[in-house]
Design a protein with these regions (language model features):
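Transmembrane alpha-helical segments of major facilitator superfamily
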Residues: 55-63, 149, 249-259, 338, ...
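Symmetry-related core transmembrane helices of the 12-TM Major Facilitator Superfamily/SLC fold
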Residues: 171-189, 363-382
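A late C-terminal transmembrane helix in Major Facilitator Superfamily
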Residues: 329-359
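Helix-to-loop junctions at the C-terminal end of transmembrane segments
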Residues: 65-79, 164, 262-275, 357
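Structural signature of the two symmetry-related core transmembrane helices
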Residues: 82-96, 277-292
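Intracellular juxtamembrane helix-capping segments at the cytosolic ends
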Residues: 119-134, 314-329
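Hydrophobic core of transmembrane alpha-helices in multi-pass small-molecule transporters
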Residues: 25, 105-122, 221, 301-315
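Helix-loop boundary and gating motifs at the non-cytosolic
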Residues: 9-60, 213-219, 223-241, 248-249
Length: 388
């Protein structure tokens, strides 16, 4: 596909098989619970702001290694079910260690390393989806996959809020969700292994656009850095401002519900105008959302800013994945590239706020700057004639 070639309409994607959809859903429930649960638990265990940031940075480095070294091997082997089962089983074991660590460094980081096998699950599941169809159906496939992930994330946030309000440990529910992912994974079949000769022929037929691919990686990393900053520091900022921990998930929940509403419109925009222009719109939403939050600190402003941010959250994950699929050179390769590069964004989003003392709202000016940089990069790509 050239940079200007776009399907005029999005073909209907086949339905996701039930075991695969179940694995995606339960994995997303895990993500929804731990998005708030892990930072809050680390804070409650007495870890400082720097220690929490370092934990996420180390985890990001681990996830990068998994997705650049392990996942490509799994992809070439045809996404064997044994690999999916092994990696999914490591996730609940890791979270149990994190929960039991009490801040003990060795146990905490061993648990984090095991838990981060979660970063390999979506590439393995999406690789199975990509193997069943591609081309013009990509928007529909990714939108359907993303809708399942958002729904699970919403359910995870609801569970966190209910359990926290009841005085129960939400992380145990996350462990149960991770175990359910493994159960569903038993019904996810392998795909045919990639023949080396076919891989070489495919690369020759569709040469990698190196500079555009690197720019796409940078664009996704910037948008992920904004999302990581939000994921780590928004709950901590809210709690330090006097907002009860149980009142934070409703903010994220409202944003996630609006993600579902924004996703079809973003998919249509990508299909007709290209993923690069769509990501420019996504970055603009990030600029607006955190401009609101950095200037006004009320709970209402928190809700409004995250409602606006819903466009960014829905777009960078679905359209960003689509852009990498189209520039990475092969079905399923974009998913592992995505999961690797978002870890770089995780490092940026975790470390940059350390230049701000405490949980000051000036942290969110950094998010504005990162989103604005992503906006400029997307516009530069678009003006250069790249649509994808």
């Amino acid at each position: 596909m050239t940079s200007d070639a776009l399907p005029t309409t999005a073909a209907a994607a086949p339905r996701l098989p039930r075991p695969l959809a179940g694995a995606l859903l339960s994995n997303a429930v895990f993500g929804g619970i731990t998005a708030v649960g892990v930072p809050v638990a680390l804070n409650a265990a007495g870890l400082s702001k720097v220690q929490i940031a370092v934990f996420f940075v180390v985890n990001a480095a681990i996830a990068i290694s998994y997705n650049t070294l392990l996942v490509p091997r799994i992809r070439r082997a045809g996404y064997p079910r044994s690999a999916l089962l092994a990696t999914s089983l490591a996730v609940p074991a890791g979270l149990l260690l994190v929960r039991a660590s009490g801040g003990h460094v060795v146990v905490l980081y061993l648990g984090g390393a095991l838990m981060l096998f979660v970063s390999t699950l979506v590439p393995q599941l999406f690789g199975r989806v990509a193997a069943r169809g591609g081309g013009a159906a990509q928007e529909s496939s990714i939108a359907r996959l993303r809708a399942v992930l958002i729904s699970g994330y919403i359910l995870g946030l609801i569970l966190y809020a209910l359990l926290a309000q009841a005085g129960l440990d939400p992380l145990l529910a996350a462990v149960a969700a991770a175990v359910l992912t493994t159960v569903c994974a038993t019904g996810c079949p392998s795909t045919p292994a990639v023949d080396p000769d076919a891989r070489v022929a495919s690369a020759a037929a569709r040469p990698r656009l190196v500079l555009v691919f690197v720019a796409a990686l940078a664009l996704v990393a910037l948008l992920k850095s904004v999302d990581t900053l939000r994921a780590i520091y928004l709950p901590l900022f809210a709690v330090s401002s006097g907002v009860p921990a149980a009142h934070v998930p409703p903010v994220l929940l409202a944003s996630a519900v609006l993600e579902l509403a924004a996703l079809p419109a973003l998919t249509r925009l990508s299909s007709t105008r290209g993923s690069v222009l769509t990501l420019a719109v996504v970055a603009l939403a990030g600029v607006l959302a955190f401009s609101i939050l950095s200037s006004t600190q009320s709970y209402a402003a928190l809700l409004v800013s995250q409602a606006v941010y819903a466009v960014a959250a829905a777009g960078y994950q679905s359209i960003g994945l689509l852009l990498l699929e189209r520039t990475s050179g092969g079905p399923g390769a974009g998913a592992s590239a995505y999961m690797a590069v978002v870890q770089i964004g995780t490092v940026l989003g975790a470390l940059l706020p350390l230049v701000v003392t405490g949980y000051d709202p000036r942290i969110f000016l950094l998010a504005v700057g990162l989103a604005a940089t992503a906006l400029l990069l997307a516009l530069t790509l678009r003006l250069a004639g790249h649509r994808f």
